[in-house]
Amino acid sequence: MKLPFFLASRFVAGETLDESLPVIDELNRDGLHVALDKLGEHVHDREEALAARDIYIDLVRTLAGRDGTEGLHNRISIKLSMMGQMIDEDFCEDNLRQLLEVAAEHDLFVRLDMEGSDLTQSTLNIFEAVYPDFPNHVGPVLQAMLKRTDRDIDRMCELGVSVRLCKGAYAEPASIAYQDMTHIRERYLDYTERLLRHTDDSGIATHDDRLIEATKTFADRHDIGADEFEFQMLYGLRRTTQREMAQDGYNMLVYVPYGTEWFPYFSRRLREKKENVWFVLRSLIKG
């Protein structure tokens, strides 16, 4: 049974691009950068992968052509598993290159989402294959909960790559991922400090006040300007905080997903915070 979209509307901008564009425009008017993501994952058919590539190319052109975005750095966020990663890495890399050629033409950045741990190495392999040709227009996501991220951070700092750092929302076994949130926060802050020291324009993707304040303090103590990195949050969460931080002079990016395949993303948001579950329950009661 397909659940009604209104349940996810707090976290997903719309089921179509046209439904999502007014959301993007409103965020931009408030001085917030946007990363637009077409929801979907794990494509196993070549024609579907090619169609996903073409959708991403259209997203680049759509965002690049929006009015009122002067001084903002809108971008798209993509999943390589939608472009054939699980079919053939070379096929996926070719699709990504075609997308990045268009992105470079429009000077628009493409963020490579990090999915489950089974795709981590493949994602980084493909990233490193294309990065030398598009150093200003592509960067990966790293998850603080994964034990391997320590060495991945070192590698990205060596390259000077823009990284989106998040805690990680996928269920992973204790053999490869930290399970204790206190430990994950400690790793997150360590990785944040290394990224701020050695990369430009990395994204500190967190809603955690302790991590936000610690990041601000570290940047101040080391004379790292607010224009040298950005905070990132998800659409529908901490909306007042997003605007307040932008007003305080910080770069604030909002990750804005859309599409009909919203249920996996919606489920991950519910697992993350009990407040999200209460929001959905209230919506059901009101409905």
Model-predicted regions and their roles:
Residues 1-287:
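Positively charged, amphipathic and often flexible ligand-engagement surfaces
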